[in-house]
Amino acid sequence: MPALSTGSGNDTGLYELLVALPAQLQPHVDSQEDLTFLWDVFGEKSLHSLVKIHEKLHYYEKQNPVPILQGAAALADDLAEELQNKPLNSEIRELLKLLSKPNVKALLSVHDTVAQKNYDPVLPPMPDDIDNEEDSVKIIRLVKNREPLGATIKKDEQTGAIVVARIMRGGAADRSGLIHVGDELREVNGIPVEDKRPEEIIQILAQSQGAITFKIIPSIKEETPSKEGKMFIKALFDYDPNEDKAIPCKEAGLSFKKGDILQIMSQDDATWWQAKHEGDANPRAGLIPSKHFQERRLALRRPEILVQPLKVSSRKSSGFRRSFRLSRKDKKTNKSMYECKRSDQYDTADVPTYEEVTPYRRQTNEKYRLVVLVGPVGVGLNELKRKLLISDTQHYGVTVPHTTRPRRSQESDGVEYIFISKHLFETDVQNNKFIEYGEYKNNYYGTSIDSVRSVLAKNKVCLLDVQPHTVKHLRTLEFKPFVIFIKPPSIERLRETRKNAKIISSRDDQGAAKPFTEDDFQEMIKSAQIMESQYGHLFDKTIVNDDLAVAFNELKTTFDKLETDTHWVPVSWLHS
């Protein structure tokens, strides 16, 4: 490996070395996993800050600065007193004014504290009323300012004692290292709490500002330091602790929205995890329901929260056929003729809670991620797809569908369709080689997995639109799909913007384009709501197609970022 240049000729170039390392090491790293790890490690902001601090300290160690005296504040007071007895001129007045300023006095006081190495806090004297036969008692004084204490308490059912139930990571109690789970609380600011309810004690703590003094009996059980590595999860549901009757302390809860990335700080409690929002500078963690607990209570409520399955009417079946439209040149075949075999209803087996994720950025030598487009019939998904293809035919591609119908004279195999026998089609169906398939007039039509691979192998972005239930089957290490939901605007905007537009209808055998009706708008809105409710946790991006040009620009910008930016993907995609 060639020598690395730090950009400086002395030993203070550690920071420059840290910045240069990832790019220098990239040609020598074989696996994507190792490269991602190196970028994460050397790109950590906290590490950069520590290195800068190290360099500053290293510099001052060489200078070996030592305080000239340990009583600068007293000396300044003496000087001011002496100057008062001298004839006052403008310079003396200015100096006296400076020495009398509170910030200058505070600076000199801090200087003396550092010079005298007087860092330990002054604890209050030990109370005289402690029984000699009583258990060991600790007197703890914490300064919490306006932040929460960062601990929860409960009443022990057997002894009736008030004990610490949980220490919140990053809170005042956690940072102090003096309070632990299981410690028995006896007094708060001199107020006995043995006969009080936890709610009353919480009120005392809430009303206390600045320093708080605790009298506690330490827990016999020693806590083992947590060795958990960094774990990030994507929330697949909305959560508001104020609406959760099961949470032990609503004030300690952490609210989040579907799609938020959370860093898990502790899983010590099987029911309530501690987490914080990724990238949040606030170190304090909050409580969230654990994966197992959330799955269990959602499963119990499931019969009540299930929505009606989305029935595939003759009109809605055209949504299945969208995967074929842009692959064919014969406009006469553009009619709703497919009955989707795998979209009779939404799959309700999964209980979405959390998904463990990790940062991922596509490398230049990697295949593009599969782009999956989802949306209700009539929302404009096909037009957006068509505009994308026209914008760059060398960069975007679509699949060629398979069919068992006879080839027509003007058609070429592999262009409009891939023509195969009925027996081979049915065999491929049994072997799960089709993403979706349907039947019309005794002929099969379908989109195969190999057709997706073919587009990706040409170093193109494959645009695939499918029914939403199919998305979860595509979420694999091979495809790493990015799922975009094209959502309709409000029904008022639909009436305003689509009044002159037309939709392909399947109510007659000709599949003629007819103007939108009020029923079409209602079906579009209802279908979108069900899709979002049942499969919204699988969508990476939602674009509202209110204005086609605006929606297209947003879609194009999303694709550009997808190819260059870092995104959160399931851990299984990188560590399978």
From Swiss-Prot:
<dbReference type="InterPro" id="IPR014775">
    <property type="entry name" value="L27_C"/>
</dbReference>
<feature type="domain" description="L27 1">
    <location>
        <begin position="10"/>
        <end position="64"/>
    </location>
</feature>
<keyword id="KW-1003">Cell membrane</keyword>
<dbReference type="GO" id="GO:0005886">
    <property type="term" value="C:plasma membrane"/>
</dbReference>
<feature type="domain" description="Guanylate kinase-like">
    <location>
        <begin position="368"/>
        <end position="560"/>
    </location>
</feature>
<dbReference type="GO" id="GO:0071896">
    <property type="term" value="P:protein localization to adherens junction"/>
</dbReference>
<dbReference type="GO" id="GO:0005938">
    <property type="term" value="C:cell cortex"/>
</dbReference>
<keyword id="KW-0796">Tight junction</keyword>
<dbReference type="InterPro" id="IPR008144">
    <property type="entry name" value="Guanylate_kin-like_dom"/>
</dbReference>
<keyword id="KW-0963">Cytoplasm</keyword>
<dbReference type="InterPro" id="IPR036892">
    <property type="entry name" value="L27_dom_sf"/>
</dbReference>
<protein>
    <recommendedName>
        <fullName>MAGUK p55 subfamily member 7</fullName>
    </recommendedName>
</protein>
<feature type="domain" description="PDZ">
    <location>
        <begin position="139"/>
        <end position="220"/>
    </location>
</feature>
<dbReference type="GO" id="GO:0005911">
    <property type="term" value="C:cell-cell junction"/>
</dbReference>
<dbReference type="GO" id="GO:0005923">
    <property type="term" value="C:bicellular tight junction"/>
</dbReference>
<dbReference type="Pfam" id="PF02828">
    <property type="entry name" value="L27"/>
</dbReference>
<dbReference type="GO" id="GO:0005912">
    <property type="term" value="C:adherens junction"/>
</dbReference>
<dbReference type="InterPro" id="IPR027417">
    <property type="entry name" value="P-loop_NTPase"/>
</dbReference>
<feature type="modified residue" description="Phosphoserine">
    <location>
        <position position="409"/>
    </location>
</feature>
<keyword id="KW-0965">Cell junction</keyword>
<dbReference type="InterPro" id="IPR020590">
    <property type="entry name" value="Guanylate_kinase_CS"/>
</dbReference>
<dbReference type="InterPro" id="IPR036028">
    <property type="entry name" value="SH3-like_dom_sf"/>
</dbReference>
<dbReference type="GO" id="GO:0016328">
    <property type="term" value="C:lateral plasma membrane"/>
</dbReference>
<dbReference type="Pfam" id="PF00625">
    <property type="entry name" value="Guanylate_kin"/>
</dbReference>
<dbReference type="InterPro" id="IPR001478">
    <property type="entry name" value="PDZ"/>
</dbReference>
<comment type="subunit">
    <text>Heterodimer; able to heterodimerize via its C-terminal L27 domain with LIN7A, LIN7B and LIN7C. Forms a tripartite complex composed of DLG1, MPP7 and LIN7 (LIN7A or LIN7C). Interacts with DLG1 via its N-terminal L27 domain. Interacts with PALS1 and PATJ.</text>
</comment>
<dbReference type="InterPro" id="IPR036034">
    <property type="entry name" value="PDZ_sf"/>
</dbReference>
<comment type="function">
    <text>Acts as an important adapter that promotes epithelial cell polarity and tight junction formation via its interaction with DLG1. Involved in the assembly of protein complexes at sites of cell-cell contact.</text>
</comment>
<dbReference type="InterPro" id="IPR001452">
    <property type="entry name" value="SH3_domain"/>
</dbReference>
<keyword id="KW-0677">Repeat</keyword>
<feature type="region of interest" description="Phospho-regulated basic and hydrophobic (PRBH) motif">
    <location>
        <begin position="289"/>
        <end position="383"/>
    </location>
</feature>
<comment type="similarity">
    <text>Belongs to the MAGUK family.</text>
</comment>
<dbReference type="Pfam" id="PF00595">
    <property type="entry name" value="PDZ"/>
</dbReference>
<feature type="domain" description="L27 2">
    <location>
        <begin position="65"/>
        <end position="122"/>
    </location>
</feature>
<keyword id="KW-0597">Phosphoprotein</keyword>
<keyword id="KW-0472">Membrane</keyword>
<dbReference type="InterPro" id="IPR004172">
    <property type="entry name" value="L27_dom"/>
</dbReference>
<dbReference type="Pfam" id="PF07653">
    <property type="entry name" value="SH3_2"/>
</dbReference>
<dbReference type="InterPro" id="IPR008145">
    <property type="entry name" value="GK/Ca_channel_bsu"/>
</dbReference>
<dbReference type="InterPro" id="IPR035599">
    <property type="entry name" value="MPP7_SH3"/>
</dbReference>
<keyword id="KW-0728">SH3 domain</keyword>
<dbReference type="InterPro" id="IPR050716">
    <property type="entry name" value="MAGUK"/>
</dbReference>
